[in-house]
Amino acid sequence: MLCRKWKKSIAHTVCSYNNIFGIAVRDNARMNTIATTSAAQAQQEIAEEFAFFGDWTERYQYLIDLGKQLPSFPEQWKTEEYRVHGCQSMVWLVPSGDALSMHFEAISDSAIVSGLIALVLRVYSDRPAQEIVDTEPQFIATIGLAKHLSPTRSNGLAAMLAKLKAHAAQALA
């Protein structure tokens, strides 16, 4: 990748961002379709994408842009039934499907949290319930996200993952 060889500059940032954003748009377009890779492969792809960025300012901007690419979320789903408690911002998570293939829709009123949702959906949505239950979110540590989230965002992310896995466990019961 020619862009990665450039010294840290605005051109480098734009080039890296455009390369990654193209990947993100394609992957987010797949969020509402059958997943073509395993959860482990999705985590690896996320790690590779985040490796392109030089600093956390770029990574946060990427998260914000991922959140903007989430599919529209119907207002009628923004109910207490679907709300994820434990998040400082408002987050809603709607499960569908069965143990063979679970699909999740989610949204937040926070731009960065919506980006986190996009990553979580990429790893966990459109997968068998057993794979969801068995998959640990290794990408969080791999990309250094745990060190760069506030405690309230970390708690919210943990609450979202717990609720998602609880839905999968319920589908298996």
Task: Give residue spans per PLM region.
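Conserved interaction-surface patches within small, structured recognition/assembly domains
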Residues: 94-110, 121-124
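Glycine-rich phosphate/pyrophosphate-binding loops
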Residues: 126-143
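N-terminal intrinsically disordered, cationic/polar leader segments
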Residues: 36-46, 51-90, 97-98, 140-171
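Solvent-exposed interaction patches of small proteins and small membrane subunits
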Residues: 81-84, 107-108, 130-132
